């Protein structure tokens, strides 16, 4: 049985990116950095990024990733 409080890989990545302040082009993180900071397996990380990009929660620029304003709003909604 799954823990009802278990977060999806995409939500875990979203929260991790916020926690490491990947919130602008200047603080964007490369895939290797995200892999180090998250506890996600490689395939989970890539799938989570694909999902977050498709929803507009994450922006990719020159191989680095950061949260969009929408992604930041989603994280903030978790804490309020």
Locate predicted features.
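Short alpha-helical segments that sit at the start of domains
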Residues: 1-23
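Short amphipathic alpha-helical interaction segments
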Residues: 39-54
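A short, conserved structural fragment
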Residues: 53-63
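Short Asp/Glu-rich motifs
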Residues: 54, 71-72
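Minor-groove-contacting beta-hairpin "wing" of winged helix-turn-helix DNA-binding domains
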Residues: 64-69
């Amino acid at each position: 049985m799954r823990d009802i409080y278990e977060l999806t890989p995409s939500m875990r990545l979203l929260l991790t990116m916020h926690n490491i302040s990947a919130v602008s082009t200047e603080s964007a993180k490369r895939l290797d950095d995200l892999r180090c900071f998250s506890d996600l397996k490689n395939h989970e990380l890539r799938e989570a990024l694909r999902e977050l990009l498709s929803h507009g929660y994450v922006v990719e620029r020159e191989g680095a990733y950061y949260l969009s304003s929408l992604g930041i709003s989603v994280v903030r909604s978790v804490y309020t």
